[in-house]
Amino acid sequence: MDNGLPILMVSCRPENRKMLMRVFDGLPIDSYSASRVDQAREALKSRNFSVVFCEERLLDGTYFDLLAEVRMLHPATRFVVMLCTGEWEEYLEALRLGAEEVLRCPLQPTDVDLALIHAMRSGVAKREMAAHA
């Protein structure tokens, strides 16, 4: 699909990618998957994503490596951290650094759904504000 909500999934854990794909199935979503920070960076250079779902730790870095770049290149992109350690300090740190949402692993379909709803609402609100400016 090429005209759905553009989403970047950055995950080295197959179970997280499978859960995200299960939730996305049948929705108007154009998803791209990366398992490494360098792959995600290439994707971010070629496309503006509405949402980035990123695991806290990847094979070649962490979500923080991408979050700073997303904020610089595409400040309107919503960034969702998938927290697999379950440590409260990590959760607070991700929010402090600019993530809009933090989902705990194992991912729950309703949590992913809510993150998508928030992204869609945010996109609609930004378009409406731009139209009235």
Regions found by a protein language model. Give the residues of each.
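Two-component/phosphorelay signaling modules centered on CheY-like receiver
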Residues: 13-33
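Acidic, metal-coordinating helix/loop segments flanking the phosphotransfer/catalytic sites
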Residues: 35-51, 55, 59
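Short amphipathic alpha-helix used as the core "switch/output" element in two-component signaling
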Residues: 64-76
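Alpha4 helix (beta4-alpha4-beta5 surface) of REC/receiver domains from two-component response regulators
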Residues: 65, 86-101
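C-terminal output helix
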Residues: 107-116
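CheY-like receiver
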Residues: 121-133
